[in-house]
Amino acid sequence: MTRHSFSALVTLALGFILFGTTSARARAQTTPQSAEAQPPAQTADDDDDAKLRPLEPDFTVVNLPTTLPLPMGAGNFHLTHRFVGVNWRRDDLSTIASNLFGFDGPAVIQLEYRIAVMKHLEAVVARTNFGRTIQFSGKYDAIHEGGSHPFGLSGIVSVEGENNFHSTNTSGTDIGYAPAIGVALSKALGRVASVYVDPIFVHNTQPIGGGAEKLNTFYVGLGARVRIAPSTFVVAEVSPRVSGYKPGDAEMAFALEKRVGGHVFSLVVVNAQATTYAQLARGANPETLYIGFNLARKFY
């Protein structure tokens, strides 16, 4: 990634944040007559980041981001495991059973922590042992779904680097960094389900051996969460690549999810080791299926 492209990404991110802040101030400065003539754009209850959102228990679908807000000063810890020692699509039943369905094998693990540094604004850091990748990201929860808004919207920016956030990978090859920018859109369907659309653009997804036209990937993540009990959900997502570098298959995942207080646990079936935005852009190997889990804990 060139210095110019990284600077452009940072400029876009700051512009998005400043635009949201300026818009909020402009609404606050409306005249009393205007306030009496029109209902507020967002009620206090809609704007409460700590409000329980029964159909949105976690900050991810499986790997894709949601629009769940985080109260200012609060935090959230997220752990993912993908057991890659057994491939459920290629290995026979005896191999799968003898390896305890994959739990005996090695795992791709990601640790993530996010904190709300301002109202509606989250800072996130994640580290996975897949390529020793570290990802820094920010999320601005611009719109909360409620009585005055038919959907939720969050803006996302990130940058990640392999080999503990270096420009060289674990083999010593200079591959640069992979910044991303996108949005997460959410919509509740009554009291039963929520759906997500996450268009995301990632730069530098094919840094080795490709022409300039293959250096970027644009994908649109699609997700759904269906409630089958008061705090139990069936979850699914897919991340089809629309343009740019598109190796292998699109990432797909399914999960059975349970919320208990501030904890969320998901038993996951997924076709990729990917958890970061650039890894999702690079897709999955054909005929691959792993078992794993997600575990999250809110601190508020």
Predicted regions and their residues:
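N-terminal secretory signal peptides that target proteins for export/translocation
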Residues: 1-7
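Surface loops at the rim/top face of extracytoplasmic beta-rich domains
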Residues: 212-213, 222, 227-229
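Short helix-loop boundary/capping segments
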Residues: 195, 209-214
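Transmembrane beta-barrel domains of Gram-negative outer membranes and organellar outer membranes
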Residues: 30-170, 176-182, 186-205, 226-229, ...
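Signal peptide processing junction and immediate N-terminal pro/mature segment
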Residues: 20-33
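Charged helix-capping and loop-helix junction motifs
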Residues: 214-220, 249-252
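Bacterial N-terminal signal peptides
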Residues: 10-21
